[in-house]
Amino acid sequence: MKIELKSIYHSVQLSEETEAFTANLYINGVHAGYAKNEGHGGNTDYYAKDEKGRELIRQAEEYCKNLPPIEYPADKYMDAFSVNMDLEHYIDDQLYKYIEKKETAKFNAKLNKTMLKGIVYGVPDQSYGAITFNLPIVNVLAHPKGPQTVLQTIKDKILPKLKEGNKLLNTNIPESIIKSAGLKEEQYVKPTIQNIRYGTITDVDNNKNNRGRSR
């Protein structure tokens, strides 16, 4: 069975103890009813649009009762526990996924804007910090000494911060620079640029020369 929320309106301002929202409830592609929560800590309510919607909601309730319970892991405040699934919890879960997706998109849009101006590091989809340049990073890389400047900045200022889940988040820095700075693959997000196109990188050039002399 397919249970969906559409035309979701989520209010951050009205969300106090619970998430305040309104949405259309669709079951198997049919607009069956509506769902809402006023944000004051009460239950999420849902109700049918018409007689057909009432029957679809009844079927959805039965369907959700047979789904696995929701498992909540232990943390420093409470022990692990589980809650039996029902349609209300299913609707709440759909809402949380919607909010998370929206927040992730907002986060990534801000991140992408920041990485145009500098070197960005942090926990993917959660948090980040940045070291910015006076010029856009593409202009820095175009300068003859730019690649070496970026490499040295990563090595001296970013690499020491790459712990506790932090990674280099730039996708616009050539991977050859990142590797020359000493980063392992698990310490950075895969960039869209593989090799340097502008300027020179001393470490890379020296490695190439050494390989050439060893043949």
Where are these predicted regions, by residue range?
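Terminal leader/tail segments of proteins
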Residues: 1-215
